Amino acid sequence: MSSLLNIENLNVRFNLRYQKFHAVKDVNFKINSNEIVGLVGESGSGKSVTAMSIMRLLPEPKASFDKNSKIIFDGEEILSANKKSLRNKRGSKISMIFQEPMTSLNPFHQVGRQIQEAIFTHQSLTKEVSKQKAIELMELVEIQNAHNKFNSYPHQLSGGQRQRIMIA
């Protein structure tokens, strides 16, 4: 079985004004299709930096990767991928659920519309069909009364509901 995600020799440094900080050192792992994996470690151990590296969300050049670092997702080398290719993958093939969804959800937009926008952006669906799909996804992650919650703002939901919205 070929791996969906292959991390080899991941080394991430933050280039600060007067020094370089080595945030992630020699991380290696593989994840196969349909495999569920948790990234566990102490606070400050590099879990978030590793995840953000996989998504290529770190601010470059302030964050840099060693030359021998490799992140291969679905056969494509992520560290050398162009922005358009990355944009097409994010949200449709790969995504990240942040610990605190309030920092990821726009507080000025209804949660259902935020899901709908992601669907509309990545799939060729009408607004009405993408709205229905958003409601179905909310139901799939067990948001009670999803049709009405579609119009809720993030602050109107519990922390667990906000995390499930991000999963949807």
PLM regions and their residue ranges:
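ABC transporter nucleotide-binding domains
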Residues: 1-168
